[in-house]
Every structure is written in structure tokens, then in C-alpha cells.
Amino acid sequence: MNISKIIFNSVKYPFKNLAKLPIICILFILIAIIPIGKLLDNNYVVLIGVIAFFIFILIVPGYFLNIIKVGTRESAMLPSLNLVNSIQDSIRVLILRMVYMIVPVAVFFILLSTVGSESIKMLYNFPFHGFIATFGLVILAILITYLIFEFLLFFAKARLAYLNSLPEALKVHRVIADINNIGLFNIFKWIVAMLVLMVVISIVSSWVIAIPYVGFLIDICVIIPIMESIANYSLGMLYSNIDGNSHSLVR
């Protein structure tokens, strides 16, 4: 698997579709309305921004799922915006996230309720450093559980895009099989490469934000959409390597 090729093609991807790129930029304008309203101290603009934010949530996750799908096919085309399909896909992504977060949320409440109810006794019966260490372990356990399921969710979303099937994306054992077929070392290399790329883009973003008056808008409406397009397309390209081990896709 050529990780450098995946990253290189992903970086080029938004700029091969300059005619359609404004579609994403316009969508991201929706989330800029609330801070603009706050800056103007205008409650009407803030209200419009709240409505626009919900529209954003209904459309954008589904649209980026479509970009992942394009990446799995290794196509260079930016998908056209179909409102109905984007809303349907956004709902599927939301359901997927809710299901995959059941375990982390359950662990969070179980551990906090258990430790919380005993915290007073622990505070009196344990040395202070022991009390802090216990709470630290609880927080660490919650964090690890969350990161594991967030990682699984990442590839479940790619599976959803690839197979266009929510039930398939909810099959955790199939998602784990996909991860194994892609290869944990390949995924690790991809994550490191993407982190480096995102850090570079974030540095550029910080310079853009410093531009008076328009920097904030340029960042939200141009830099962030490009960053999201690169990340989602790259995930799709990474997942496309599952073809070589397609037995994990059996329904």
C-alpha cells in the first residue's frame, strides 16, 4: 500500500474540482453566521445562524460521506450536491455515531456513578495521591474506551460509504476485519502522515485567521472545507485497499 500516493492524491483532490469547490464553501458559510451575529450583537442574525447550523448538520455529514465513497472508487470527481441524498446520508451517519457511542457513554456513566458514590469514602480512607490516581485511572479508562470506538466508527463510516448499507456498517466484527485487512501498520502510517498534513494546514489556517476582518471567513469557508475534503477523500482511498481482501465484505 502506497501511503504517500494516497496523501498526494488527497491533497490534489479539492484543487482538481475548483468549479465545484464553492459548493462546500457555501455550505460552511452556514456555520459562520452565528459568530457573525455575535460580533454584530444582532440577535436576529444569531437566530438565523442557529437555523443555518441545523441545516449544516443535516447536509454536510452526508455530503462528506459521499466524498468518502468517491475516494473508495479512487475517482477524482467532487460529488454534486443532492439535498435529499445528503440529508438521508447525514441521518445514517448520525445513527451510526449514536450506536457506536453507546458503549463509551455506558462506560462513562457506570464508572463515574460507581466511583462517584464511593468518592467520599475514598477521600477519607485513601491517601490523597491514591485518590487522585484512582480518578486518573477512571478517566483514562473512559478515554481509552472512547478512542477505541471512535477509531472503529471512523472505519464503520468508510464501510457505510463503500457498501451504502447502514446494517453492514453496524457490524462491528466486519469493521474490525476491514481494519485487519487494511493492516494496522498501514493505518498507523496513514494516521501519522495525515496528522503531519493537518498540522501544516492548521499553521496556514492560523496565518489566514490573522488577516483583519476577512481572515475568519476565509478560514471557515475555504481552509476548513478543503481540509475536510482531503481527510474524507483520503479515508476513502485508504479503505479502497480492502478490495484485495474482499472476503471481509461478505454480507
Which ranges hold each PLM region?
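Juxtamembrane, membrane-proximal amphipathic segments and lipid-exposed surfaces
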Residues: 29-35, 112, 119-126, 171-173, ...
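A cross-kingdom feature marking solvent-exposed beta-strand/loop segments within repeated
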Residues: 72-81, 177
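Interfacial aromatic "cap" segments that immediately flank transmembrane helices
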Residues: 2-31, 82-106, 151-203, 250-251
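Selective recognition of hydrophobic, aromatic-rich stretches within alpha-helical transmembrane segments
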Residues: 44-72, 129-169, 207-246
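Short, small/hydrophobic-residue-rich motifs at membrane-helix boundaries and re-entrant hairpins
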Residues: 19-41, 45-72, 93-128, 132, ...
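Transmembrane helix-loop junctions in multi-pass membrane proteins
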Residues: 39-40, 200-211
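Membrane-helix interfacial "entry" motifs
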Residues: 5, 9, 42, 46, ...
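Short alpha-helical linear motifs
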Residues: 107-113, 196-200, 213-216
